[in-house]
Amino acid sequence: MAERKYFGTDGVRGLVGQAPITPDFVMKLGWAAGQVLAKQGTKKVIIGKDTRISGYMLESALEAGLAAAGLQAKFTGPMPTPAVAYLTQTFRAEAGIVISASHNPYYDNGIKFFSSEGTKLPDDVEMAIEAELDKPMTCVESALLGKASRLNDAAGRYIEFCKSTFPKELSLAGLKIVIDCANGATYHIAPNVFKELGAEIITIGCEPNGTNINHEVGATDVRALQAKVVEEKADFGVAFDGDGDRIIMVDEFGEKVDGDQIAYIIARDALRRGELKGGVVGTLMTNMGMEVALRNLGIPFVRSDVGDRYVMEKLLENNWLIGAENSGHVILLDKVTTGDAIVAALQVIASIVGSKMSLKELCDGMTMFPQILVNVRFAGENDPLESDAVKAAQADVEAKLGDNGRVLLRKSGTEPLIRVMVEGEDAELVTQYAQQIADAVKESC
């Protein structure tokens, strides 16, 4: 396959105002996507965004490009990424588009696409869009130009859908839950879902102002949530990222519960109910503790490349239903078509309520291996992963770990970073080994 120019592991992403996240490029991207995706005849495209201030500018640019291709833009306003996937299906739209850079800071933004089935686009479709981007932009005749309108009931539809995934015989009554919406797209959705199911809720990160998305709140920084759960003596806390496709939880003692543990809880509960189909898909970053815990339950486990799209591919390949990344993407194919943090949270809570166990107790069956991740900024021409010094450092650490640990080096798909991950039984040694490799990477950049 030809090398990509624009699409990364999660759409097109970058710093606002610099290529490719500029109004002129995004307008042409909308047009190019329209040329490739407009095959159903409905001519409708659902467009959602998170709470970044640049979302206003970029949705206008997308609208212009789609209109030039003869498509109708339907705006949801701030809306979680999985909500756009859901609404794309229910409105029988040609495609869904999300304007978001997910967990990144506010000055980044991105564009990602969903097919008419509510799934992320396969590689060949993204390459077809890139091919259209190399062509001169054209415009349909005036009578065929697209129009734009707003979907005023989008939030209500999605709230009802989320609630429908929670068992009707259960209730959240009596639970005190702290919800952290990262000042992002779930700020007006998640509190209503949990409140309407009966919980007492306390919110943080629910006051977006355009520039505070993911800032010291949300799934990538749970310190505020941890403190609030302990302060309020809550049963647990739930943190979402800026676009609502990642979830991290916090138990009653303020301890972090990541995507690996969440998937383990959901899979074990499905096994208990006799409803588990197949096994669980993790990634190269999934903690070895999850693999061991699932094996002890007799649940099959396989790893995919890093990225929720690759988790999805492996799920479909195996005809399984549960997949996750430790960063908090949790995919439950019996309920959704993409990672949905609110729906994943509800399944964990259903296990808490149904088993009458605490979140901490549900996590106790899985012992996490110490895992250290060091990010090294990479902006040079040379590929440090091809350096003899880096290869030697990796080989040395792998020899020392033997069968009791792992080393993973990879380039980030969304940022100019080399990620160095070392995992093993001894936290002190793992930290030392990770720094040894990271130092070699820095010297080779």
UniProtKB/Swiss-Prot annotation:
EC number(s) from the headed UniProt entry: 5.4.2.10
Active site as annotated: 102
GO CC annotations, alphabetized: cytosol
Family annotation (SUPFAM superfamilies): Phosphoglucomutase, C-terminal domain (SSF55957), Phosphoglucomutase, first 3 domains (SSF53738)
Cofactor note: Binds 1 Mg(2+) ion per subunit.
Keyword Electron transport tagged: no
Sites of Phosphoserine modification: 102
One GO BP: peptidoglycan biosynthetic process
MF annotations from Gene Ontology: magnesium ion binding; phosphoglucosamine mutase activity; phosphomannomutase activity
Class in the EC hierarchy, top level: isomerase
Cofactor(s) the protein requires to work: Mg(2+)
Reactions performed catalytically: alpha-D-glucosamine 1-phosphate = D-glucosamine 6-phosphate
PTM: Activated by phosphorylation.
Pfam families: PGM_PMM_I, PGM_PMM_II, PGM_PMM_III, PGM_PMM_IV
Binding site for Mg(2+): 102, 241, 243, 245
Keywords: Isomerase, Magnesium, Metal-binding, Phosphoprotein
Highest taxon of source: Bacteria
Family: Belongs to the phosphohexose mutase family.
Role of this protein: Catalyzes the conversion of glucosamine-6-phosphate to glucosamine-1-phosphate.
Name this polypeptide is given: Phosphoglucosamine mutase
Species name: Aliivibrio fischeri (strain ATCC 700601 / ES114)
Upper taxonomic lineage: Bacteria, Pseudomonadati, Pseudomonadota, Gammaproteobacteria, Vibrionales
Gene: glmM
